[in-house]
């Protein structure tokens, strides 16, 4: 029986360097705090005081662009350029860097250079992009830290377009590299490449390696109605968007259009932008499927040391050039694959299309009764008939896409402008506000998806004004906890993923944020009314043009309330405050895009409950990661907000104190009190009741977002620091520091 052991003859696993059975192997559902410890100075090799913006601005930008332009036609023997031009490859590299972005949590995208790391560097959709980045290395090496990989990959895509005759909309630098894989992103629950059995209720199990998906239409009749799991924006594990062969490999252009519309919308693209991107991008280059994927070796993360980070070694022919295998599809869209023109759209409507197979066995389409006039990438004596992908034909056979495609065909200038704008949005959507943009090619035009905020056009309030305004705020008669809740509600919309949200703009007073359940509209309205009255009184009294924005007042009111709460608890402390925020208008606020930022849960305010899949404490950690908080910062903020009585609905859950409204460490003291016994209250496991162990009398109620700080070993260790007798002062100091951090997360104008 020994020969049937599943581990028989397997090489022993390493027993050093963190190998062996890990905690997550024993307890796979354990709350993971690792995502709160990423991208710190520990993993960053650059000097702590390195200023990337200053380094980028010292770059000879146009010399860099010239070097990139020259690279486009400098074909290398080790990885030859299709048609003698790397443009198509580099467009794909930039697209796939930016195209992982999704709107629900702002994660993904090209803003951190994550394509260099697992899993993205080994996704089936990113085959051969390891070569693209290696082609760029001599240029990255030349310019060093003056340009990040994140910026370089996007800029190279721009230069590729320009080198083939397309006028781009512009380019903004400012993407800082990270130095490790971002483990905060949920890419899906599938365990095989190209699978979608988790993201769809009747999905496809996938395969163990990249290549053509074997279609089985009988098993996938829901492709016209299925719903993609949130927050995902890709139809298969390891793909950027959709399966180019069609849903689950079924060559159905209409069903494919449904997948396209869903995935592109989740990346913030409307139908016109979607058509422009597909038709514009497929004007250039080709796909690669010279033979079966059986010839293709392991992805970079599974390749041997000698491969030096390259993957997908190809045993077919030379393994490169004409023998390249990437997607398994073999399509060159136009007769001029290195020039911008209308050929893609012209062919789309000129020909009738017949289903065929690529040399690798993938579903694709060939023009019926057409002559062979498409050039071969490596043999000038060869010509091919026009071919298309299933997802290309979606632009013709989906009624809405067809209407847009025909308009673009009849109006070339509209097509070019739409593609330029959509490409800029694709490659800059995750950069946040324009204040982060740097470089000489930043477009002057302000775009609605950039969440614009007016520039400061008046003197800001002084220290004397700040002190007077604090007194006015505390004299309004509004419970200070409402000012704290309002400030938190405003600032905590920030997402470190795509740099959206935050207190600047005061969008908390506008639709849709003012109506979010978590913001408790009656309480919010009372706080805002009091602050608006103070704003009107202050501004009308000025004769030198000085103004205070509501955005500044919202944050200042929260700071004043925190200072009062600390003082009431016996601690005199000043909460840092920097004026200069401005108020956005409703016209500057895209309601639909902001609706996607509405929190499902906010454990800092004890809002939301567990789902069948996600316990509430996991939502709390996810929120903390989006706020760029460490585990200690998350801990001290939750404990402080409970003491300050800042639950979204005014409930007593987690308010473990007899003096709510004072900034005390009572939350931790009472949470750690062994005289309290906890049990679930009611039928669910979201609300708990704490009783006195001796008398059985009820003492407290709590949520999972409260009790996790006593249950989770690492969080309990932090809680013990703040719950100790000598932890009171440290608690107040650390709370104020973490509070100030959150209030200023979006202040790219001063940070």
Swiss-Prot record:
<comment type="similarity">
    <text>Belongs to the peroxidase family. Peroxidase/catalase subfamily.</text>
</comment>
<dbReference type="Pfam" id="PF00141">
    <property type="entry name" value="peroxidase"/>
</dbReference>
<dbReference type="GO" id="GO:0046872">
    <property type="term" value="F:metal ion binding"/>
</dbReference>
<feature type="active site" description="Proton acceptor">
    <location>
        <position position="96"/>
    </location>
</feature>
<feature type="cross-link" description="Tryptophyl-tyrosyl-methioninium (Trp-Tyr) (with M-267)">
    <location>
        <begin position="95"/>
        <end position="241"/>
    </location>
</feature>
<dbReference type="InterPro" id="IPR002016">
    <property type="entry name" value="Haem_peroxidase"/>
</dbReference>
<keyword id="KW-0963">Cytoplasm</keyword>
<feature type="cross-link" description="Tryptophyl-tyrosyl-methioninium (Tyr-Met) (with W-95)">
    <location>
        <begin position="241"/>
        <end position="267"/>
    </location>
</feature>
<feature type="binding site" description="axial binding residue">
    <location>
        <position position="282"/>
    </location>
    <ligand>
        <name>heme b</name>
    </ligand>
</feature>
<dbReference type="InterPro" id="IPR010255">
    <property type="entry name" value="Haem_peroxidase_sf"/>
</dbReference>
<dbReference type="InterPro" id="IPR019793">
    <property type="entry name" value="Peroxidases_heam-ligand_BS"/>
</dbReference>
<comment type="function">
    <text>Bifunctional enzyme with both catalase and broad-spectrum peroxidase activity.</text>
</comment>
<dbReference type="InterPro" id="IPR000763">
    <property type="entry name" value="Catalase_peroxidase"/>
</dbReference>
<keyword id="KW-0376">Hydrogen peroxide</keyword>
<dbReference type="GO" id="GO:0042744">
    <property type="term" value="P:hydrogen peroxide catabolic process"/>
</dbReference>
<feature type="region of interest" description="Disordered">
    <location>
        <begin position="1"/>
        <end position="24"/>
    </location>
</feature>
<dbReference type="InterPro" id="IPR019794">
    <property type="entry name" value="Peroxidases_AS"/>
</dbReference>
<keyword id="KW-0479">Metal-binding</keyword>
<keyword id="KW-0349">Heme</keyword>
<keyword id="KW-0408">Iron</keyword>
<dbReference type="GO" id="GO:0005829">
    <property type="term" value="C:cytosol"/>
</dbReference>
<comment type="subunit">
    <text>Homodimer or homotetramer.</text>
</comment>
<keyword id="KW-0575">Peroxidase</keyword>
<dbReference type="GO" id="GO:0070301">
    <property type="term" value="P:cellular response to hydrogen peroxide"/>
</dbReference>
<dbReference type="GO" id="GO:0004096">
    <property type="term" value="F:catalase activity"/>
</dbReference>
<keyword id="KW-0560">Oxidoreductase</keyword>
<dbReference type="GO" id="GO:0020037">
    <property type="term" value="F:heme binding"/>
</dbReference>
<protein>
    <recommendedName>
        <fullName>Catalase-peroxidase</fullName>
        <ecNumber>1.11.1.21</ecNumber>
    </recommendedName>
</protein>
<feature type="site" description="Transition state stabilizer">
    <location>
        <position position="92"/>
    </location>
</feature>
């Amino acid at each position: 029986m020994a020969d049937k052991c599943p581990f028989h003859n397997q090489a022993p696993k390493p027993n050093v360097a963190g190998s062996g059975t890990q905690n997550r192997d024993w307890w796979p559902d354990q709350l993971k705090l690792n995502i709160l410890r990423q991208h710190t100075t520990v993993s960053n090799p650059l000097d702590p005081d390195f200023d990337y913006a200053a380094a980028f601005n010292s770059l000879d930008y146009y010399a860099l662009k010239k070097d990139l332009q020259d690279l486009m036609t400098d074909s290398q023997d080790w990885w030859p350029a299709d048609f003698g031009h790397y443009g198509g490859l580099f467009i794909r590299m930039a697209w796939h860097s930016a195209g992982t972005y999704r709107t629900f949590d702002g994660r993904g995208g090209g803003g951190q250079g994550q394509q260099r790391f697992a899993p993205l560097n080994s996704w089936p959709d990113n085959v051969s992009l390891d070569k693209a980045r290696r082609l760029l290395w001599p240029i990255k090496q030349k310019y060093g830290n003056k340009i990040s990989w994140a910026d370089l990959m996007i800029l190279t895509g721009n230069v590729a377009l320009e080198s083939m005759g397309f006028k781009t909309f512009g380019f903004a630098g400012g993407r800082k590299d990270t130095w490790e894989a971002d483990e905060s992103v949920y890419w899906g629950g599938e365990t095989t490449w190209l699978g979608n059995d988790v993201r769809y209720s009747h999905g496809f199990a996938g395969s163990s390696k990249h290549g053509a998906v074997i279609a089985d239409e009988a098993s996938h009749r829901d492709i016209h109605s299925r719903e993609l799991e949130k927050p995902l924006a890709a139809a298969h594990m390891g793909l950027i968007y959709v399966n180019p062969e069609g849903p689950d490999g079924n060559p159905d252009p209409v069903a494919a259009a449904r997948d396209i519309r869903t995935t592109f919308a989740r990346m913030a693209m409307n139908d016109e932008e979607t058509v422009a991107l597909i038709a514009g991008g497929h004007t250039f280059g080709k796909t690669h499927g010279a033979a079966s994927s059986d010839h293709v070796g392991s992805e970079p993360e599974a390749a041997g040391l000698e491969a030096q980070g390259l993957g997908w070694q190809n045993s077919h022919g030379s393994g490169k050039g004409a023998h390249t295998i990437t997607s398994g599809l073999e399509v060159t869209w136009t007769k001029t694959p290195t020039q911008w023109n209308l050929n893609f759209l012209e062919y789309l409507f000129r020909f009738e299309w017949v289903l065929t197979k690529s040399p690798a066995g993938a579903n694709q389409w060939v023009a019926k009764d057409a002559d062979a006039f498409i050039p071969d990438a490596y043999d000038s004596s060869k010509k091919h008939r026009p071919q298309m992908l299933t997802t290309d034909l979606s632009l013709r056979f989906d009624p809405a896409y067809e209407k847009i495609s025909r308009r673009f065909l009849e109006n070339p200038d509209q097509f070019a402008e739409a593609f330029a704008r959509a490409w800029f949005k694709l490659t800059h959507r995750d950069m946040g506000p324009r204040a982060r943009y740097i470089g000489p090619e930043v477009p002057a035009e302000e775009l609605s998806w950039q969440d614009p905020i007016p520039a400061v056009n008046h003197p800001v309030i002084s220290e004397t004004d700040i002190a007077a305004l604090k007194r006015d705020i505390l004299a309004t008669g509004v419970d200070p906890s409402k000012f704290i809740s309002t400030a938190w509600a405003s600032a905590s919309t920030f997402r470190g993923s795509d740099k959206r949200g935050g207190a600047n703009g005061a969008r908390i007073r506008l639709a849709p944020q003012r109506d979010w359940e978590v913001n408790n509209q009656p309480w919010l309205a009372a706080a805002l009314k009091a602050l608006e009255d103070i704003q009107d009184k202050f501004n009308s009294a000025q004769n030198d043009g000085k103004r205070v924005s509501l955005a500044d007042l919202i944050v200042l009111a929260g700071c004043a309330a925190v200072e009062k709460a600390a003082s009431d608890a016996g601690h005199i402390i000043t909460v840092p405050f920097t004026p200069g925020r401005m108020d956005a208008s409703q016209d500057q606020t895209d309601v639909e895009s902001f609706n996607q930022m509405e929190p499902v849960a906010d454990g800092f305010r004890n809002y939301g409950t567990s789902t069948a899949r996600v316990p509430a404490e996991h939502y709390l950690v996810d929120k903390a990661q989006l706020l760029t908080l460490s585990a200690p910062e998350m801990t001290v903020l939750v404990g402080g907000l409970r003491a300050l009585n800042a639950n979204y609905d005014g409930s007593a859950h987690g308010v473990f104190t007899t003096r709510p409204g004072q900034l005390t460490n009572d939350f931790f003291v009472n949470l750690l009190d062994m005289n309290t016994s906890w049990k679930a209250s009611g039928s669910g496991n979201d609300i708990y009741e704490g009783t006195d162990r001796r008398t059985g009398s009820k003492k407290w109620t709590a949520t999972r977002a409260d009790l996790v700080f006593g249950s989770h070993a690492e969080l309990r260790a932090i809680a013990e620091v703040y719950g100790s007798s000598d932890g009171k002062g440290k608690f107040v100091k650390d709370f104020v520091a973490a509070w100030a951090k959150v209030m200023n997360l979006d202040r790219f104008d001063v940070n």
